[in-house]
A protein has these predicted regions:
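Extracytoplasmic gate region of multi-pass secondary transporters
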Residues: 43-97, 190
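Symmetry-related core transmembrane helices of the 12-TM Major Facilitator Superfamily/SLC fold
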Residues: 1-13
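Cytoplasmic membrane-interface "Motif A"-like loop-to-helix N-cap segments
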Residues: 108-121
Length: 203
């Protein structure tokens, strides 16, 4: 719970102040709540839609990690876990935090499009593997989930940075509003669709 407070203090005292060139600053050509320039910007919307898919996958995984690990553990006769499944699920999700930060650093070195494509393809392969991994050792399943947690989030910062970079001049705030509003619809739909698929295919 102290995270936001620490972030505010870090921003105030640690982030250097930047002097903006008023002459170079862009002002919107329409009113502040006009999102049409953003919606017409194909480059920015590509990142927005990519982030939507990212959130769909991320929140589906987070919402169902505990249930999945409980099911996988129930199939392992030799299971001897030192901590609870809930704690394991929390640890699995924590692997994604540094992956998001480091992912953008790799994107800067390798190229943003190349990095995002590589991570999304890798994440898709891991998702398919994990879906069929429940009969394996629970420790192997947990290891795959940790790796999957990292690949899910490794493109997060790169997608947001890409949207910022591609924002139409004067519409950075509007671009971020569209970015968040549309993308977090995917956050709502991911767990919902996952649950529906379980119900549809349950025996």
């Amino acid at each position: 719970a102290l995270g936001p407070l620490l972030a505010i203090l870090a921003t105030i005292f640690l982030v250097p102040r930047i002097k903006h060139d008023k002459e170079a600053a862009h002002t919107p050509t329409t009113h502040v709540l006009d999102f049409r320039p953003v919606l017409r910007c194909r480059a920015a919307m590509a990142y927005v839609l990519g982030y939507t898919v990212h959130n769909f996958e991320l929140f589906a995984f987070r919402a169902w990690t505990v249930a999945f690990l409980v099911y996988a553990a129930s199939l392992d006769d030799d299971i001897n876990l030192p901590i609870s499944i809930i704690m394991l699920a929390a640890i699995v999700n924590l692997f994604g935090v540094p992956a998001s930060i480091l992912g953008n650093e790799f994107a800067l070195k390798l190229g943003r499009h190349r990095w995002i494509t590589l991570i999304m393809l890798t994440s898709s392969v891991l998702a398919c593997m994990i879906g069929f991994s429940t009969a394996w050792s629970i420790w192997l399943v947990i290891g795959l989930c940790c790796l999957y947690s990292m690949t899910i989030t490794a493109d997060s910062a790169a997608l947001t940075a890409g949207a910022v970079e591609a924002a139409p001049p004067g519409y950075l705030g509007a671009t971020m509003a569209v970015h968040s509003s549309i993308a977090f619809t995917g956050s709502f739909l991911g767990p919902l669709v996952f649950g529906i698929m379980l119900d549809v295919n349950s025996s």
